Amino acid sequence: MASYDLVERLNNTFRQIELELQALQQALSDCRLLAGRVFELPAIGKDAEHDPLATIPVVQHIGKTALARALRHYSHLFIQQQSENRSSKAAVRLPGAICLQVTAAEQQDLLARIQHINALKATFEKIVTVDSGLPPTARFEWVHRHLPGLITLSAYRTLTPLVDPSTIRFGWANKHVIKNLTRDQVLMMLEKSLQAPRAVPPWTREQWQSKLEREYQDIAALPQRARLKIKRPVKVQPIARVWYAGEQKQVQYACPSPLIALMSGSRGVSVPDIGELLNYDADNVQYRYKPEAQSLRLLIPRLHLWLASE
């Protein structure tokens, strides 16, 4: 059970995040808007969080409307702030960018504010995921007991400032989470599950235990040097590719929230060129580079565990 002191830290850290976000919103509102472009994505309905998305239609908002939506989005932390038909398990995404004219001093002040907010968000995430000592299944209940309706992913998400970018382009990224494992590491994972028997619907406790035992035996029968990997697909994500002319470099950013471009004009760029995010269509994805697929055999579907050929 998490201590009273930890609960107090959880609440205090979150209140600081809220206050700092309010102050940042005001500071950003006081700046002159040079350009704004954000892309509204369809709402994810309840029980549809894990459904694969073949298409994602995009609705564009520009100018002052984009700025207003961006500022609201940064503080969208609770399910009470959204439609009751929208999933409470999927954080709202609003890719795009707002570009603001600032002096060098204002730029440094805003960068410091954003850095402080991101540090508070990291502290909040650590309190929930590490300091609480709770397993993932218990964290949700604990957090929502103290902060009812909180969308935890939105609370964790950091803000991304850009310093005098030249161009901002948007696109979609299809990715997999890949983790290489040894046979013995997988056996240890399965052993832990075997030592904590439970029912996992639709299976009874005994059926689940039997299933785990079969999985353990299948892995134990592999050679010790077998090459195993967890390869789990991640939902398609909006990304931004930002070009900095002064440094002659391109940086790719995840873009679940509007990027904050702070334009001081000190690097010869007055207003960056902001591109458009096109609708996503899984059947027409064009890959810049697609490496040759490795030969894999699926061993345990629920873990996305694969055996790589020698």
UniProtKB/Swiss-Prot annotation:
Keywords: Cytoplasm, DNA replication, DNA-binding. GO terms for biological process: DNA replication termination. It comes from the Bacteria. GO terms for molecular function: DNA binding. It is found in: Cytoplasm. SUPFAM superfamilies: Replication terminator protein (Tus) (SSF56596). The keyword DNA-binding applies. GO terms for cellular component: cytoplasm. It holds the Pfam family Ter. The keyword DNA-binding applies. InterPro entries: DNA_replication_term_site-bd, Tus_dom1, Tus_sf. Trans-acting protein required for termination of DNA replication. Binds to DNA replication terminator sequences (terA to terF) to prevent the passage of replication forks. The termination efficiency will be affected by the affinity of this protein for the terminator sequence. Belongs to the Tus family. NCBIfam families: rep_term_tus. This is DNA replication terminus site-binding protein. It comes from Klebsiella pneumoniae subsp. ozaenae.
